[in-house]
């Protein structure tokens, strides 16, 4: 799940979450500084003025369960780190911190699928939105032809 509707200091950076159980309506999210990554209800996503539901393209769908398993084991309950990937290796088997887009990226990177569309040191929500490995399932408040120009 992605939204374009999050801003800090005038920068529209968005927010990302990894759906860990569609049936239970559960996500794993890195919320903000000072808060460890935690499980949330998908109900909160109904309040965003924009959202994008993306999933791996058919040839990569089997990686979703592997990504969730990695996230449950390694990415839940870790500190928020706005600069994850800058001063440390971008991918770590046992990360010391993460931010929202990095959490989703790291879960899939553990399966060998690199969702970072520009390959930079920092993974952003825009990078995920523009990943060649993801299909759009549903959008609200976003042009499906131009997810995030």
Task: List the predicted regions and their residue ranges.
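Glycine-rich catalytic cores of cysteine/serine-nucleophile enzymes that process amide/ester linkages
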Residues: 1-59, 83-95
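Secretory-pathway/luminal and periplasmic proteins that interact with or process carbohydrate-rich
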Residues: 10, 77-80, 113-114
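Short, surface-exposed linear patches
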Residues: 23-25, 49-51, 76, 104, ...
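Acidic, low-complexity intrinsically disordered regions
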Residues: 41-44, 76, 144
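Long, low-complexity intrinsically disordered regions
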Residues: 52-109
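Activation targets extended, charge/polar-rich intrinsically disordered C-terminal tails
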Residues: 91-149
